[in-house]
Design a protein with these regions (language model features):
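Extracytoplasmic
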Residues: 1-69, 73-77, 130-133, 153-155, ...
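Interfacial amphipathic helix/helix-coil modules
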Residues: 143-187, 198
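Membrane-spanning helices that line or support transport/gating and their immediate boundary helices
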Residues: 191, 195-196
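Non-transmembrane alpha-helical coiled-coil
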Residues: 97-157
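Short, charged, surface-exposed interaction patches
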Residues: 60-64, 68-73, 114-118, 122-123
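Beta-strand-loop-alpha "switch" segments that mediate conformational coupling across diverse proteins
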Residues: 1-8, 69-112
Length: 198
């Protein structure tokens, strides 16, 4: 997160967003946290926080409030979604997460395969037994196939079935439910107060 995702997102979009104006596609930031005019952080903070949100604090917010992974038990497909007031930011972050996960695992698996191939080539040079050389040759063939797969596609771990899109309908908050619940609770509270006064 710190090396691959955080440098590619605008931190106030994660840590200081108040709302999003769909007519102008403008993000409005919380004035208590971030000065949009000067592009500086002005938030109140207490130890261990800092004026500018740290990578750990940003990671906690991103993982607990923004990012969602779910797996369909029947198909095994994984759905990655981002919750954000701006659907454009949500789309961009979803694409970023998929790209960076693919990149991370491609680099990791490529390094492991290369190390294994070097080791196997060294073992092949050291041994004279035909049976062991045959086993090593099979292992080398498997590693070569893996290297080919790693290099062949940009979508190494995750591939899109349904690419990230700008959503037309809000996911949260559902204002109608909030209004109905507020009216219901207000009515109950009002009746309770009337009963207490009598």
């Amino acid at each position: 997160f710190t090396d691959n995702i955080l440098p590619n997102i605008f931190l106030p979009d994660l840590m200081a967003i108040k709302s999003w104006d769909p007519r102008t596609n403008t993000i409005i930031y919380n004035k208590k946290d971030f000065n949009q005019d000067t592009q500086t952080w002005i938030r109140d903070f207490g130890y261990p926080q800092t004026q500018i949100p740290s990578a750990q604090e940003s990671f906690r917010v991103f993982m607990s409030e923004k990012l969602n992974f779910s797996q369909n038990k029947d198909t095994g497909f994984i759905t990655i979604s981002i919750k954000h007031q701006s659907p454009y930011v949500a789309q961009a972050w979803t694409e970023l997460v998929v790209k960076e996960i693919n990149y991370f695992f491609r680099v990791k698996d490529k390094a492991e395969a290369q190390t294994s191939m070097i080791f196997l080539n060294n073992q092949m040079a050291k041994t004279s037994l035909a049976e062991i050389r045959q086993v090593i040759a099979q292992l080398l063939q498997q590693k070569t196939q893996k290297m080919t797969l790693i290099e062949a596609s940009n979508f190494y771990v995750f591939d899109y079935i349904d690419p990230p899109a700008v959503m037309e309908q809000k996911a949260e908050p559902q204002r109608a439910i909030i209004v109905v619940l507020g009216a219901f609770l207000g009515s109950i509270l009002g009746m309770f107060i009337v009963l207490i006064r009598r």
